[in-house]
Amino acid sequence: MVMNRERLAEMLLEVGALKFGDFVLSSGKRSDYYVDIKEACTHPKVLDALTDALLEVLPDGDVLAGPELGAVPLVSVLSVKAGLPMAIVRKRKKEYGTGERIVGDVRGRKVVLVDDVATTGGSLLEALEAIEEEGGEVRDAVVVVDRQEGAEEALKERGVRLSSVLTADDLRGLRDAESTARG
């Protein structure tokens, strides 16, 4: 194992990518913590550690694909480390140029979805639909953090297994340890 879960969570906290407080998520839900993997990815050592950890849980596949914006640095570095081609799934088709929604070739390939954080699974499901429309097959998804708020179940209903490096329980455990240490 490259690095334990607790140390990864500590690294996120150290670079300001893990915050505790009162936050509104993109899903509209409120949360007592916020994970900003995009911020974490701006720190080379953290990006390296996160992608090493993702590599450990990465299932077999032909192509790695992730939705813009959060997955782009992760899928890029992971592609190099795994020696696999990558694809980026845009939120919507471009209105100019080629007009494509997916950058990279997924047609007829087994695609592993990669993302930063999974809450309800909405962005992963949107990426899944785009990949399937282009003729790709998705059976697995990997994320840095599973917030344990329905993504695993939503993906399972579509025949996709979700693996994560960290969970909400891991992050709350760190928060509780920090609170205890401060007394």
Swiss-Prot record:
CDD domains from the UniProt entry: PRTases_typeI
Pfam families: Pribosyltran
Reaction catalysed by this enzyme: orotidine 5'-phosphate + diphosphate = orotate + 5-phospho-alpha-D-ribose 1-diphosphate
Keywords: Glycosyltransferase, Magnesium, Pyrimidine biosynthesis, Transferase
Positions of 5-phospho-alpha-D-ribose 1-diphosphate binding: 90-91, 94, 115-123
GO molecular function: magnesium ion binding; orotate phosphoribosyltransferase activity
Gene3D superfamilies: 3.40.50.2020
Enzyme class name: transferase
InterPro entries, A to Z: OPRT, Or_phspho_trans_dom, PRibTrfase_dom, PRTase-like
Its EC number(s): 2.4.2.10
One biological process term in Gene Ontology: 'de novo' UMP biosynthetic process
Transferase listed as a keyword: yes
Listed SUPFAM superfamilies: PRTase-like
Tree of life domain: Archaea
Xref: PANTHER family: OROTATE PHOSPHORIBOSYLTRANSFERASE, URIDINE 5'-MONOPHOSPHATE SYNTHASE
Quaternary structure annotation from Swiss-Prot or TrEMBL: Homodimer.
Its job: Catalyzes the transfer of a ribosyl phosphate group from 5-phosphoribose 1-diphosphate to orotate, leading to the formation of orotidine monophosphate (OMP).
HAMAP family linked: PyrE
Name this polypeptide is given: Orotate phosphoribosyltransferase
Taxonomic lineage: Archaea, Methanobacteriati, Methanobacteriota, Methanomada group, Methanopyri
